[in-house]
Swiss-Prot record:
Tissue: Expressed in prenatal liver, intestine and lung, and in adult intestine.
Cellular component aspect of the GO annotation: cytosol
Annotated organism of origin: Mus musculus
Domain notes: Forms a beta-barrel structure that accommodates hydrophobic ligands in its interior.
Protein name: Retinol-binding protein 2
Length: 134
């Protein structure tokens, strides 16, 4: 595994995305559209500074952060909530904790070979996404 997450990543699989969205109280119609979409992630990393773009035909979401620095995040690309977000390194894995209305919310992201792995968590729901480097 490596800490380098730079690149353009295309989604290969998206397991339990609907369960994750239900845990976030996302409406039925939006969930039905979102589960059918393929996402592309564009990550620009300079040390601990990240600029991330998640693009699909339905919605795009940009997230810029510095590892170890808590910030206010508006999750407008997903459920429209305001959360306090902190991203840290655990070995070569980015670990994000999002404090707010929903319990046990956050994500883990890491690279192995030409694959980017992302686990999204809310409550007892875990969505596992795999992306391949383009």
């Amino acid at each position: 595994m490596t800490k380098d997450q730079n690149g353009t990543w295309e989604m290969e699989s998206n397991e339990n995305f609907e369960g994750y969205m239900k845990a976030l109280d996302i409406d039925f119609a939006t969930r039905k559209i979102a589960v059918r979409l393929t996402q592309t992630k564009i990550i620009t990393q300079d040390g601990d500074n990240f600029k991330t773009k998640t693009n699909s035909t339905f919605r795009n979401y940009d997230l810029d952060f510095t590892v170890g620095v808590e910030f206010d995040e508006h999750t407008k690309g997903l459920d429209g909530r305001h959360v306090k977000t902190l991203v840290t390194w655990e070995g070569n894995t980015l670990v994000c904790v999002q404090k707010g209305e929903k319990e046990n919310r956050g994500w883990k992201q890491w690279v192995e070979g030409d694959k980017l792995y992302l686990e999204l968590t809310c409550g007892d729901q875990v969505c596992r996404q795999v992306f391949k480097k383009k």
